[in-house]
Every structure is written in structure tokens, then in C-alpha cells.
Amino acid sequence: MYKSFTAGTKKEAEFLAAEYNLKRKEKPKDVTVGDAIDGYIANKDGVLSPSTIAGYRNIRKNQLQELMDVPLSKLTNVMVQAAINREAHTLSAKSVRNAHGLLTASVAMYMPDFVFRTTLPAKEHKVKDLPSPKQIIDAVKGTDVELPAMLAMWLSLRMSEVRGIRYKDITENGILTIRNVRIAMAGQIEKEKTKTFHSTRQLVLPERILNMIGEGEPDDYVVNLSASTIYKHFVNTILEKTGKHMTFHDLRHVNASIMLALGVPDKYAMERGGWSTPSTLKNVYQHTFSEERIATDQKIDGYMEGFFKDE
């Protein structure tokens, strides 16, 4: 029997469909692995970050497909291990672990007594040969990805955070508040709050980046390129100019390396990058900065400005 659902948004319709699909099963043994994952995603939507939900939906659609129609009552560790082994041939260890994590969390909602005994691929320790900050700056200069790249490498912003900045998020004295992210899910742009409580943070924009940003209407976005366009243009530009492969997210790693080289204390490194935890940092959602934080910002700005001295 086919049943369609109509709701105010696609997200609400998907929740109703998942809820109906689970309720119509008379016995727990009729619930499949796919049903359980759909139910888990619907249950967590609005609680977990939009990027996490998008990742879950991608896993549901493309990974561990041989398990999706298996009733939970018939699921065995042998089946799970076989599916994981097959995925390990084409996916990275991290991707396999993410898929397994979604599987275990979903099954636990409906069969809390099921014990997984899966052997997962060993974690990979990759040492990437990335371009230097100077090479990156020279490569993107004058391109449509210069501003996104500088925001990511200089201020340690994620792609979704770069795309979520609006002019009203920047005060007259140049303080940027990271409030929202923009993520494309199922072909639709969704504006959501930042990934975690500590992703919501404030940064002092250096004059160079303020000049790149310019002026605009309060509700206008500073960066209007799609995530896929930014990613493709950046990767292709870096490869063409430096001969090295680098993802946009690698810019955050470059930023972390810069802070490490400059001896920036972990407290301020995590604060700038949105990695902080309650045990290391108080709430930073305010318009004042400690003297130590200001000194840290100036130290990083001075280092980055050094790459532009030939202009």
C-alpha cells in the first residue's frame, strides 16, 4: 500500500512518513534496519546539526544497502560484519565508522539489548602535503574564492559558516558573530543555527578581510556562491597553481597549524575555531575580549599580513 504525506515543509513530511512506516508495523520483528534508521533520523532532526543530519541521510541512501531490508529480528553480527567488510573496500575508515555509528545508534532505539561485535577498519593517520599559507594566498588572489578561503584560513571558519555570514552579523567596529550556517540538503538551502553551542562565537575581523567583504544590505549574505562551486573552484585553483590536492576544509587545518607554530594557547585556539568545551572556556557570546585574546588575534593577524607585504 502506498501512502503520501503532505506537510508545511519537506522535513515535516519525511518525519510523518518515517513515523507512519514504524507505527504500521504490528510487531517489532517487522521493523527493518532501514525503518530504524529512518526513525532515528526523524527523531534527531532539529536536535543534531543540519550537516550531521545531511550526512545521516547520505549514509541511509548510499551505504550498507544490503542491510536496509533486513528485519531487526533477523539481524546478526555476521551480517553486519560482512556489510562493513564490503564497504571498507571502497570507503575510508572514517566513512565506514560513521556508517556503523549510525547503524548502532538506530538499532539501539528499537533493540537496546542487541550487542554489536563488529571489527572496524583501523583509523587512518594521513600526513597531507599541503601548500604553505603563502602559496594558498597567492593561488586564490583575485579569484571568486579568495574571500571564502581567507575567512577559512585566517579565521578558521567552516564552509557552512562562511556561507552563513550576513552583513548584519558584523558590527561597526568589525566584530563578526558566527550565528548561523547555510547548508544545502536535498537540493534545498537550509539556514540553521551553528553546529554546536561553542560554534557560536565572535571574531575580530582584520582590516584586510573587512575591505574584501565591503558593504551590503543587513540581511544579504556576504558569500553567495554555492558550497559545491566554492569547493570545486578552490580545489581546481590550488591544484593548478601549486600542483597539490587540497580540500576547502583543509584550510581549517592550516589555521590550526599556524596557531600551533605561533604558540597560541589551546584556550584561544579552540575559542577562535569553535572547538571549545565548557571545561576550557566560558561563554564567549559577548562583545568584549580579554587582553590575552586580543593579543592572540593581533599575533595571528600580524603573521598573516606578512604574506601581503610585497603588495
Predicted regions, residues:
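N-terminal DNA-binding recognition helix of tyrosine site-specific recombinases/integrases
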Residues: 70-119, 158-160
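C-terminal secondary-structure termini that scaffold catalytic or DNA-interacting sites
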Residues: 184-202, 207-209, 215, 298-311
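Short, aromatic/basic-rich helix-turn unit that serves as a nucleic-acid recognition element
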Residues: 2-5, 33-61, 87-91
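Catalytic-site neighborhood detector that most strongly recognizes the C-terminal catalytic loop/helix
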Residues: 130, 210, 273-299
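Long, amphipathic, Lys/Arg-enriched alpha-helical "connector/arm" segment
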Residues: 121-145, 154-157, 208
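Short, charged phosphate-coordinating catalytic segments
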Residues: 109-114, 150-180, 267
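Active-site/catalytic core of tyrosine-dependent DNA strand-transfer enzymes
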Residues: 130, 204-244, 255
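C-terminal catalytic core of tyrosine-transesterase DNA break-rejoin enzymes
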Residues: 94, 144-146, 150, 154, ...
